[in-house]
From Swiss-Prot:
GO terms for biological process: ceramide biosynthetic process; sphingolipid catabolic process; sphingomyelin metabolic process. It catalyses: an N-(acyl)-sphingosylphosphocholine + H2O = an N-acyl-sphingoid base + phosphocholine + H(+); a sphingomyelin + H2O = phosphocholine + an N-acylsphing-4-enine + H(+); an N-acyl-15-methylhexadecasphing-4-enine-1-phosphocholine + H2O = an N-acyl-15-methylhexadecasphing-4-enine + phosphocholine + H(+). It comes from Caenorhabditis elegans. Keywords: Hydrolase, Lipid metabolism, Magnesium, Membrane, Metal-binding, Sphingolipid metabolism, Transmembrane, Transmembrane helix. GO terms for molecular function: metal ion binding; sphingomyelin phosphodiesterase activity. Catalyzes the hydrolysis of sphingomyelin producing a ceramide (N-acyl-sphingoid base) and a phosphocholine. C.elegans contain specific sphingoid bases, which are unique or different in structure compared to the sphingoid bases found in other animals. Two examples of these distinctive compounds are: 15-methylhexadecasphinganine and 15-methylhexadecasphing-4-enine. Mg(2+) binds at E83. Its EC number is 3.1.4.12. This is Putative neutral sphingomyelinase. It is a multi-pass membrane protein. It is found in: Membrane. GO terms for cellular component: caveola; cell periphery; endoplasmic reticulum.
């Protein structure tokens, strides 16, 4: 029996009167004959380095327990986390929240793990991991990005048996030094690969959501390329009135807590003391989305997971983002007016950056070979010194180890980097040609 228009009106009023981030499941909404369904999502860079201080993260175990309690209390539909580097931390967290989030997945990659994982209240029917072809430099041991093996992880989540959500979570290479950004070609290539991955795997999905720490600010080329090429919307920007963020020259205008800063916030206890005097917080954590076969409407996107209630500690050195979406699956989504930045100029700029990285890789290769030759000369020269034989033996061993690394980096490491940059450049060029 079809419900009357009066009954539908009453049901609609009930839904509108419910508080923000209500805790009803999709199944309950369907039982109430409501066609528009709600989806609540949260993302956080959890900052959980398992190594001991000063390398590891401060208060890691306590903070992770509080994050788990927050997840249980808030009853989100999907949770995306980054920098959960230890698989044992993931297992411990999944056991803590399993009563509410019975479905979860950790994306394994690299030597230390990708740190990326997903928790869901609804069945995860399939997963796919795409490791970025460029992940920094092997000899930058003090950074660690190369050992982590950054990825974008896709989880296909099925809700009520008929709604397919493609949920992506990722963590791109860190910036470290904006004025002398050695990793900019790598991060730009990662941004292009992310956009390509979403673009090709999202076909057929009802809802598409991309979350994570992109390590790029809203005006950066890589972020603008992700939005334009994958046709995604920035949830925070759509929920808050902001000026045009596409001007690199006015970068500082878009920093600060009021502008959605998620990192280096002065109200965070883990922020460096030098950054607490001025609010120069950066917005580098994002919630991106687009409609698939269903119409998706953003209801709100807000900062969350800042300070732990009743404590002077924060959940992480970043803050999280939460969003609430309304999904209308009564009819197939119709294409909206193109509101994205033109794609071609961004691709042309990106190919220039990637080509610059390719040239730098060739130069570095020669540099490392020269260093290897210098090590060989020093080793041979030390053979003519008969004083301190033990000391020179140790020196020769150390020079041999360093020299072998220089040869490996020049012959293998930089060749792999150059080929990955070349592949990214050719992929971009192919799109430009078409």
């Amino acid at each position: 029996m079809e419900p009357s228009s009066e009954q539908e009106s009453q049901e609609s009023q009930k839904v509108d009167m419910e508080p923000v981030f209500r805790r009803e499941s999709f199944a309950a909404l369907r039982r109430n004959n409501v066609a528009a369904r709600q989806l609540r999502v949260v993302t956080l860079n959890a900052w959980c380095l398992p190594q001991p201080w000063p390398i590891g993260s401060t208060d890691r175990v306590h903070r992770l327990n509080k994050i788990g309690q927050y997840m249980i209390d808030e009853l989100y539909d999907i949770v995306g986390l980054q920098e959960l580097w230890s698989y044992y931390d993931f297992v411990r967290l999944s056991e803590q929240v399993s009563s509410v989030y019975p479905y979860f997945h950790y994306f394994h990659s690299g030597f230390t793990g990708s740190g990326v994982c997903v928790f869901s209240r609804h069945p995860i029917v399939s997963t796919l991991t795409n490791r970025y072809s460029l992940n920094g430099f092997a000899h930058h041991i003090h950074r660690g990005d190369w050992f982590g093996g950054k990825v974008v992880g896709l989880t296909e989540i099925e809700i009520d048996g008929d709604l397919r959500v493609n949920f992506y979570t990722t963590h791109l290479h860190a910036e470290y030094d904006r004025e002398n950004d050695l990793y900019l070609p790598h991060r730009t290539a990662q941004a292009f690969e992310l956009a390509q991955f979403v673009r090709h795997t999202a076909r057929g999905a009802d809802v598409v959501i991309v979350t994570g720490d992109l390590n790029m600010e809203p005006c950066d080329l890589g972020f603008r390329l992700i939005l334009s090429h994958a046709k995604l919307f920035d949830a925070w920007r759509m929920s808050h009135e902001v000026e045009n963020e596409d001007s690199e020259g006015e970068l500082l205008k878009f920093r600060g807590i009021a502008k959605g800063g998620t990192c280096d916030r002065p109200d965070n206890c883990y922020t460096k003391r030098a950054l607490k005097n001025v609010d120069d917080s950066k917005r580098i954590d994002y919630m991106l989305f687009k409609s698939g076969r269903c119409n998706v409407k953003l209801e709100e996107c807000e900062i969350t997971l800042n300070q732990i209630p009743g404590e002077d500690l924060n959940y992480s050195d970043h803050v999280g983002l939460r969003a609430r979406f309304t999904i209308d699956d009564r009819f197939r989504h119709e294409k909206s007016v193109n509101t994205w930045e033109p794609n071609r100029p961004l691709l042309i700029e990106a190919i220039g950056l990637v080509a610059g990285g390719e040239r730098r890789a060739r130069t570095d290769r020669i540099f490392f070979f020269i260093l290897a030759v210098i090590c060989l000369i020093l080793i041979l020269g030390s053979l003519f010194f008969e004083v301190f034989p033990m000391g020179f033996a140790v020196l020769r061993f150390a020079l041999t180890v360093v020299g072998v690394f220089f040869v490996w980096q020049g012959l293998i490491g930089l060749t792999l980097e150059r080929k990955a940059l070349k592949a990214a450049k050719q992929a971009i060029q192919q799109i430009l040609n078409n």
